[in-house]
């Protein structure tokens, strides 16, 4: 083995090593409030960085196209079995590289190109893969969309049913990326059955809440359920498909060889670890605390005069109308970033502003909850958000808030064993 193979990252590539160290400090010293982000455990990090990254394993356990897959089979079977146990599903495919690829494979397992799909409009909280014209879903399928009412900013299921009757979709999609309320899965299944459609639920954002019992499960109602494995589930960035046994063969063929070649065995190992963590009793407390924190934060921001889309949240996320205060979402994102609070700009329902300068911001609580923060911290964070937005053009004020944010972050330490090298670099 060459000497280069035994070099540390810092020795082999100091530029990448420095970027990682700086990212470690960024994550520790700030408040991560992007709703789709979280912090994985040390065990998940170790599995994701394991020697399984070297292994090719096309096919499925016991049916591989390569030799030497006996231990790859072990971790994939562990991941599949744990996913089924966690969500009460009959079948699980843990090979999708991402939520988008999970959706693509799931769609192609039950419908054909040119068929009609009915999903939540992206502008009302849906996702690109639910029918956006620039996405594969909008190019391969005929797209119909449902949205939220203008007065309540929640889904009108009578209107959804009327659209389904009119459009006759082959598949109805539940789930989204910026909808703060619980979907009525039972009603959606009734509508799907009425028009002869499949019901697919994309629970990427709230899968961890489902796993922890803090959110109703779509599994008993949907023909197929897809999800990412990060976000509230607190695993590696990847995908997962759950389905009834009758769809298992079609789903598996659609993933491999339909969408992908070899799976990422090191990521399947990390998924297995994350699923085991989510099966532990303390994960239920974690999931409920995410929701409690989100509600406390939304209430605190509302108390400061900010309009919360739909009036609140039932999940881990909320949308804030900052344009009502004369602030663009892009301006709010930038100001909060300078204050050490990471959020993302986001359109709100019936937004008249362009996508890159929308009227809202999206905020989530999974990552802060992972660090151990609770309702008291949410109230303080709300005050910082309000102050940063009010003083968005005052660099010294934003810097002062950032200092206070870092003081709080230090009370909830993150990745201490990694920070040793990062802090040495900073010195």
UniProtKB/Swiss-Prot annotation:
One of its GO terms (biological process) is glycine biosynthetic process from serine. InterPro entries: PyrdxlP-dep_Trfase (IPR015424), PyrdxlP-dep_Trfase_major (IPR015421), PyrdxlP-dep_Trfase_small (IPR015422), Ser_HO-MeTrfase (IPR001085), Ser_HO-MeTrfase-like (IPR049943), Ser_HO-MeTrfase_PLP_BS (IPR019798), SHMT-like_dom (IPR039429). (6S)-5,6,7,8-tetrahydrofolate binds at residues 122, 126-128. One of its GO terms (cellular component) is cytosol. Keywords: Amino-acid biosynthesis, Cytoplasm, One-carbon metabolism, Pyridoxal phosphate, Transferase. Its cofactor is pyridoxal 5'-phosphate. One of its GO terms (molecular function) is glycine hydroxymethyltransferase activity. Pathway: One-carbon metabolism; tetrahydrofolate interconversion; Amino-acid biosynthesis; glycine biosynthesis; glycine from L-serine: step 1/1. The record marks 230 as: Plays an important role in substrate specificity. It is an enzyme of class 2 (transferase). Homodimer. Belongs to the SHMT family. NCBIfam families: PRK00011.1 (NF000586). This is Serine hydroxymethyltransferase. It comes from Acidobacterium capsulatum (strain ATCC 51196 / DSM 11244 / BCRC 80197 / JCM 7670 / NBRC 15755 / NCIMB 13165 / 161). The lineage of its organism: Bacteria, Pseudomonadati, Acidobacteriota, Terriglobia, Terriglobales.
